[in-house]
Amino acid sequence: MRNLSARSLLDINSLDEHQRYLSLMKISLCSALVGSLAMWSMMSQAAAQAAPQTPPTTAPAPVVRQPMPVPWPIQMGLRSFQVEARIPVVDKVVLVPDTATYLDEISRWTLRGRWPILIEDDLFTPMFVRAFKPSKVIRRASVGAMPASVDEQQALAKYAITQAWTVPGSEARPTNPAEAFASARFEPLGIVFASMSDPAWTAGVALAAGHGQVLSWLDGPFDPPSSTMNPQQFEKLSAQIEDAARATGLRYAALGDSIDAVTICRSMPIKVEVPQSAQWAPPAGTNPKPGEPVAVTDALCRLSDGTRWAIASTIFGDQIRSAYIAMSSLYLMPRSVWMLNTYQTDGDWGRYAMTEGGAMLKQQEFETTEFSGVQASAVSWLNMLMGGFKADVLLMNTMGNSDFFNMWQNIQCYPEDVAMLQHPMALHLIHSWSLTSPESRDTVGGRWLEHGVYAYAGSVFEPFLAAFVPPSLVAQRVANLVPFLVASRWSEGPFDATWRVTLIGDPLMVIPPPSMPPQPRLAPSSLESAKGETDVKENARAALVAAKTTGAPAEYATALLDLVMTGDDAMAAQLWSIAVAKGDAVAVACAPSALGPLFRQRQSDAFLAAYRLIPAPTLLDQDMLWQLWTQQLASIKDRAVLDWFGQQVRTVRPAVDLSRLAPEIKRVAGTDAARVLVTAWLEKTTNAEARKHIRELLLGLQ
């Protein structure tokens, strides 16, 4: 197995605490490898026993036991984890205002220490900080604009990766990433494709620098993710990917060699109508109709006979979200796993039960919660939405389409019911069509991504149940250091052929079991600071002192926002109470930043008061409103408050909110009042499908 050489990294980690950690981790990894091989052997034996048996015609030959080779998925996870374990993490998060400063900060990573870097925003930044829990959150001043030319931009990106892999104290002075990897005696684990003309390059550069991967440019026009690539475009893309792998000079043609991961960090179609050939033949017996698509990430990285040579995934989105996806993958240590099963337990559905996988995760000290039966009902789901999900990982079985998902007993929920998240979350979703239009918030998958899912295995079309890896098997693989997205893909059997499950995120992201020793973090003071750094918590204190002196609403708003950025929701909620006491001007200035903390703290009345002060709530604000209050509408007795909720109905599918609000208006003000509300929405709704559902609701209001 190729890894970081002892001389290149162990010698430069001079801190005793990190040396002790590495010694403990070596023992833990050996133990984990033994367990992983045993688990893999058991799965292989179970598969063999399930196959039809032919009676032997001759006496069996003596069995000569050979050492079991390490399966490539476990090799892949161990290689990724070794990089993670050997390079210390600094206990801080750095917030930057723009992409030029982002690249400059990545160039400050070294083999002595790295840290998360986020392009500051008010959704993904505090979400990441709440999960990472750094001792300091630092804000950097801008270093200026990016250079105008693409060549200069590419040079800056490659420089950042080179710096991150230059061995401190070495006489080597690498001028590019390949030379830096060579000087560190390190063999890259994969290839990242990006374009400086596409904003997702922020993920590409971070993943190349963080994992130690080759960065290759993939320019040219591509249609958006919801579209379908034609066969000619796909053949060209497939050839480009393989040519780039070949150009590295590393072995790539089989899983388990050097290059096993391909991450495409740019916007492109997620579906493809593949050419008719053995290279992209669908699973036997599936018989797709002409024009029906498969997943681009499942079709890529295959030899002419259809054999897979790497696991491909994609990352798309703006610069902020793409950086967040990369940093979540590189630095977070998921601990809590929710396993939610809406399926019945007999027949083929029983294979997708989660109890066995949950038991495996608990053995590895994951905080595991299983939901099934009435706990997986629509009512239970809507109750769980209040305040946002706290899970780090969600394994979920459901049925439906791109615009709805069925809970227990086939009660429908909708994209509007996709949970807000307290922490970044990885998702394995068994559900047809969830990612057919992944950039649209009006689909199940699109809403999950918008809300902060950073790793996602899901389907782009109707894949059939057997196309999904059962959650218990995913859990067993993940617990044995198989990367999360790799664990979500079949690597043998009929559904290892080109089909309809796609992967979004970092294919090298592993989830080390909590039973392993935690990696100690370096103090922020252990490395030199950059120019223009300020401590966000200290900024909040200074703004609060200024606010008490001047009474300026803007100072209160600055203090509250900075508290949110440090992940301190409880303190932010307290400051909101102070803002309200200071009068309307201060409350109005603070309200937009207060919504998130009040939602997550489940302070329903305070949230409602803040929401009503915001002239133009965002779509995410609306999601928080309805997720916090849907199950509390029955407690409202004031007709005026219910009428106000009638004005807040989300416009794409009005029947979703109306179906939950109208019965409460009927309860308080009578059937006619409820019908007036629903009729008013029918009159101002133009979408035919939405109007159909409103009419159905109106017919039921008798």
Model-found features: residue ranges?
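Generic helix N-cap/helix-start motif at coil->alpha-helix transitions
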Residues: T549-A557, D569, G583-P592, R602-L608, ...
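A structural feature that tracks compact, well-ordered secondary-structure segments
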Residues: V93-G113, E120, I191-H211
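N-terminal low-complexity, Pro/Thr/Ser-rich intrinsically disordered segments
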Residues: P52-D91, A160-P174
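N-terminal secretory signal peptides that target proteins for export/translocation
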Residues: M1-K26
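Signal peptide processing junction and immediate N-terminal pro/mature segment
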Residues: W40-T54
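Inward-facing hydrophobic residues that define packing positions of alpha-helical scaffold repeats
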Residues: W576-S577, A610-Y611, F645-G646, V678
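Cysteine-dependent hydrolase recognition
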Residues: T125-K136, A145-A585, G596, R600-Q601, ...
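Bacterial N-terminal signal peptides
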Residues: S28-M42
